[in-house]
A protein has these predicted regions:
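Cross-family detector of peptidyl-prolyl cis-trans isomerase
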Residues: 1-141
Length: 141
């Protein structure tokens, strides 16, 4: 995801830095690419597709130690992007395709579909880090 976090947002995320409540491993569906997805709450609105403009709330953790590295909720501002346009990590483009407005999902993304060998030091994401996200799809247009 090509979003930066301010020092304030990182401090807010650190305050809520606790292990996320995740579904059991066997509840996740696995994609061919290695992404794991669990639908926490199905939505009933419009379905996302390539080119959809999506507004979400999300929280992101390092899979290794569950350290939260970013949260739109902590910023009190939803994140908006266009699906399938490369404006977010490829794991998001894949995992959020076909999801309905109102859906809450948990996503486990391997490093190769996140920030890979580079990581994002400004966000506290080391190289080769698998990531975990909780995403709520607020609006699809």
């Amino acid at each position: 995801m090509k979003v930066g976090t301010s020092a304030v947002a990182q401090q807010q995320a650190a305050k809520t830095n606790k292990r996320p409540q995740l579904a059991l491993d066997d509840a996740f569906k696995h994609t061919r690419s290695g992404i794991q997805v669990y639908v926490e709450r199905p939505g009933h609105g419009d379905k996302t597709k390539d080119g959809s403009h999506i507004k979400v709330h999300y929280e992101g953790w390092l899979a290794e130690d569950y350290k939260m590295f970013d949260s739109s909720r902590a910023k009190r501002r939803p994140f908006e992007f266009d699906l399938g346009k490369g404006s977010v990590i490829s794991g998001w483009d894949e995992a959020l395709k076909g999801v309905r407005e109102g859906t809450k999902i948990q996503i486990k993304i391997p490093a190769k579909l996140a920030y890979g060998r580079i990581g994002v030091s400004s966000m506290g994401i080391p190289p080769n880090s698998d990531l975990i996200f909780k995403v709520e799809v607020l609006k699809v247009t």
